[in-house]
Amino acid sequence: MCSYVAKTLNVSLAEAYKFQKSYFREYGTSLKGLMENHKIDPFDYLDYVHEIDLSIIEKDEKLGSALTKLPGRKIVFTNAATPYAKKVLKKLGIANHFEAIFDIVDANFIPKPEPKVYQQIVAKYNISCETTTMVEDILKNLGPAAEMGMTTVWVNTNKPWSKNNSDGILPDVVIEDLSSWLLGVANA
């Protein structure tokens, strides 16, 4: 990502890193900041940053088993692009568990946690907020879901970026192991 920013803005990698982190914090995604401040082509950016080695991702049998047992609809809501999300889901061996992917392109490049994006996904898929659970690894992205009446689950990865700009957001559930939690819910 930093190499794209450095090349596109003609700055050093160190300067590109500062831009990338600043835009991520301010706009929710680096992409949105680059679009707002530098008028970059979002498709060019997405093609570049999602062309990464996914060999470290392994099939997750436990997660697949949990999703199989879990009733209800499952929709991916991501600030990434659908082709990338599909690659990750396929590597994990769980692609068949999801009926749809709502990505940054569907959202007109407006990232989570912008409330209107949550309204878009709810309308597009006729989601009942009162019976929906949103699982997320970035805490601030749960704020709008909670305000709409969804149950919120934060997967605490213990990464500093996962808590940025999240003051006052209290998820219903905090977990560290998604597969175990889902199995517990499915077996309850």
Q: What name fits each language-model region?
A:
Residues T68, A81-A188:
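Asp-based, Mg2+/Mn2+-dependent phosphohydrolase catalytic module
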Residues K62-K74:
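A short, Lys/Arg-enriched amphipathic alpha-helix followed by its capping loop at the start of a domain
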Residues V11, I40, G72, I127, ...:
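Short glycine/serine/threonine/alanine-rich loop segments
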Residues M1-G64, P83:
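N-terminal helical cap/lid subdomain that shapes the substrate entry/recognition surface
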Residues A6, F24, M35, D53, ...:
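Short, flexible active-site loop motifs that bind/organize anionic cofactors or intermediates
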Residues Y17-F19, H50-L54, G72, I104-V105, ...:
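Short, contiguous strand/loop micro-motifs
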Residues V5-K7, L46-V49, R73-I75, V105-D106, ...:
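N-terminal start-of-chain detector that recognizes signal peptides
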